[in-house]
Amino acid sequence: MWEKVDQLTPSRYSPYRFFSAQEWAAFRADTPLTLTYEEVKRLRSLGDPIDLDEVRRIYLSLSRLLYAHVEASQLLFRQRQQFLNMEESYKTPFIIGVAGSVAVGKSTMARILKELLARWPSSPKVDLVTTDGFLYPNAVLREQNMMERKGFPESYDIGAVLRFLSAIKAGMSRVRAPLYSHLSYDVLPGEYQIVDKPDILIFEGINVLQVRDLPEDGKMVPFVSDFFDFSIYIDADPRLIHKWYIDRFMRLRETAFRDPQSFFHRYSQLSQEAARSIAEGLWQNINMKNLNENILPTRPRADLILRKGSDHLIEEVALRKI
């Protein structure tokens, strides 16, 4: 009988190859740095220390790897067209899924990756869509007594997510993705991002690698990740993510929360001690539970795992073997 194997511990049985950040940086080869300091500063999220050195160390090698995957998919597409004796037709978008906990740096990573990929010599059209817009509106969550479960799998309109990704993969034009406001903490009614036949789509969200229970009647149930050509999980020790979440909350209290239109404006009026207590409660009762129950278990499903250290920078890379 097989013993349980920890797939994320380096061993002969692990499906991953593991690299330090320094080893990974060497795979950049001659990939050019096409971003400036000011652009990285604009793209990074509040409190994220990523700089050009981190882009050189991690992102340029990642860009080169993804270029190889995209080129391989295009070659396979052409060979399949030839095999089927088909006329030249539209190549479906290459979809990259980006997953990980809140406060771990998914949004920064996705935005920087989008800019790097769009600057390849082939100048592909790259779009970025987040799953936030696919959350049920707050009114629906309140009606179903799920506001404290916001961010958990059941708070998303998975049917809408699957219809969106199906339309993208079907090569449909002007596909609509609902927009979300972090200021109002709600879906923006009637507002959409238009995704029009990109070459590459980056789809970012905490639960994009989630699987669901199969129905007893044997009907096919597609998972979001079924539509991905490549998937990335941003990882870190939960104790570090906890610290980053609290630090971010306290910074937002001094910035975005001060806007009277902010859903969290009331927290800006609290003392520092009271605000920190609120943040701790949100972490313990919502975000930590979601991480342990729904997000962390999806980590072994990723093609690439980027693990961060205490300085919020990548210190280890795990790449799935092929």
UniProtKB/Swiss-Prot annotation:
| Residues engaged in binding ATP | 100-107
Annotated GO MF terms: ATP binding; pantothenate kinase activity
Highest taxon in the source lineage: Bacteria
Extract the Pfam families matched here. Answer: PRK (PF00485)
Listed GO biological process terms? coenzyme A biosynthetic process
Which protein family is it in?
Belongs to the prokaryotic pantothenate kinase family.
Q: Which PANTHER family match?
A: URIDINE KINASE
The name under which this protein is listed is: Pantothenate kinase
Q: Which gene encodes it?
A: coaA
